[in-house]
Amino acid sequence: SGPRNVINLQRVQGYQKAINESEFNLNTDLIIFNEKLIEGEQLGMVRSKKLLKKYPLLNGVFATTDMLATGLIKVAKKQNIRVPEELKVIGFSNWAISMLYEPSISTVDQPGFEMGMKAAQLLFSKISATSTVSEKTVIIKTKVIPRESSKVN
């Protein structure tokens, strides 16, 4: 089954949209997500072992966090699967670990500073409002940061 929390759901929907707009076929089994958003690398390792066993010829995976991606790469290395030559990996968030990991992890940049600024602005406007403020959805653009883990040979 797919993700149940809104953060993972939106990340997966973005991935699905990108795949549907490309020449590739969508296989949602190839998405590693974390419902709790706290256990990272360890959960990535557990899910990756199952995924690589089910799909031994797998050549690419999207993980909904960079920490899940690190777990996937760790498992791939233990199974002598070369990243990115045999398996391409992309994470989400652009945490510092994605730049420092070997190989560096391609990721979708989540602009945390901009998100915090927008949240603070919304909070201050709600605090200073004289009437009830309605719920507001704010969409902040992300971008893909290509690194070594998805490098095309």
Describe the residue ranges of each PLM region.
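Bacterial carbohydrate/catabolite-sensing allosteric modules
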Residues: 1-153
